[in-house]
C-alpha cells in the first residue's frame, strides 16, 4: 500500500510527525497525507497524493511544505516508487479556524 510506504518514508525524513488523518490532539507542526486518486496501466500504478503541512504560523507552514517537497522529490529512491513529481502546491489555510497550512499535490508512479 503506497500510503503506508510514503507515511513511513516521510516520518523518517521530516522533523515533524506525519499522519494519515488529523490527530485528536495535534502538535503545533505536522503533516497529513491522503491519496486522492489512482490508476493503473501496464502493471504500473499511479497515485495522486496530497500533503497538508500544518504549523503555528504561515511561515512555519510554508517551511514545512518545502521540507515535504524536498523529501518527496527524493521518494523515487524507494524501491516501490519509480517516479515522484510535484503537481502543484499552494497556501491552503483553513479560514474558519485560522489554522495555517500549505498543501502539496504529488503524482507518484509505483509498483
What are these regions (language model features)?
Residues 1-16, 25, 34-111:
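Charged, amphipathic alpha-helical segments and their flanking helix caps
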Residues 21-23:
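Polyanion-binding surfaces on beta-sheet-dominated domains and ring/shell assemblies
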Residues 27-29:
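Histone-fold modules and their flanking histone-like tails across chromatin and transcription assemblies
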